[in-house]
Amino acid sequence: MARKKDTPQKAALREMMGNYLKENNVTVKDGTDVNSIMRDMMSIILEGALDQEMDEELGYSKYDYRNKETDNSRNGHSQKTMHTSYGDMEIDIPRDRKGEFEPQIVKKYQNTVTQDMEEKIISMYAKGMTTTDIESHMRELYDIEISDSTISRITDKILPIVKEWQERPLEEIYAVVFMDAIHYHVRNEGRIVKRAVYIAIGIDMEGHKDVLGMYVGQNESAKFWLSILNGLKNRGVEDILIACVDGLTGFPQAIEAVFPDTEIQQCIIHQIRNTTKFVSYKELKPLMADLKRVYAAPTEEIARAELDGFDEKWSGKYPKIAKSWKDNWANLSTYFKYPEAVRRLIYTTNTIEGFNRQLRKVTKSKTVFPSDESLLKMLYLAMVDITKKWTGHRQDWGQIHSQLEIFFEERLSGL
């Protein structure tokens, strides 16, 4: 098949490139050679375009002084390193004496790679790749040298998006909100410190699941949760029917201070873990079987009777277990008042713990984050990737919604 005839522009370019390769004794053996030539071509094209922009800015071309109608003039060039898909290159940026020239093809503070490469880097960062891995990947696949600082600058573009996401308006009413914290190590002022990432996941009245917010703070505290709850209210949340939380001291009081009508369900799985961690291996299985008779009981009355029986049998060796269950019973037993479908939804924080496990898969390559911001960037990007699969609503949502309408008739009357 005959080659398609070149356009005049392509023919001129083909001739120019042929002369360039021949006169400079350039041979093209691999992709590295191609990238080198492309960098030279791109720099020439960009510099020519920048000179044209300067001509338009001043109103006269470089040596056409007779048509000069401005007191401004050219003032040499400054050099800038551009990170492109073909590697780093130096280009000359024209300057004017008054400093008024604002180039558009290469903006004043633009020196990063192309948009396509930025998206590749952000995608790799979102999947948990370290900066060293990203550097190696870009070097091997694209023959591009990219520094830690460049990767950081590119991923920093996420931070304003994260801020906007954290402040976005929310639904007026959520059927259930799950709240939990996940912990990471961060470098701070030369020391490695522990950070808690506070996470809230809501299920709205249509059954759709959404991450309402992620916040980096000190070790988990009810005081910080109080500020988060106030933030949710300021973003438009007027009511939460049921809040599912761990056993953090003061958490129920923090919720009640902001959403006084919210039912609180303390996570049963957290309670089991916290109260059985010091039980001997030999006795763990029979003790757990007796404890299951409490939380798996069909009614609260039966559960309370089973707890009393558990207390009599085990408190000689493990007095703190039954005491903890009794002390927290008001919030542990909330789910007993609801039918089975709602119980399955709220009696554990599996919804948020599953999300946390997916976050850990992404962040497992980072034992220590260089800053709070770098931690938040990676978690946000991971969250975006994870929640792409959160389409539709729960399979049994129709049943759950009908039951919630009965139990919360007054609070849902305005919907």
Can you say where each PLM-predicted feature lies in the sequence?
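DNA-recognition alpha helix
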Residues: T132-D143
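RNase H-like nuclease fold core
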Residues: P94-R97, I105-Y109, I144, R153, ...
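Acidic/histidine-rich catalytic cores and adjacent linkers
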Residues: R3, R293-L415
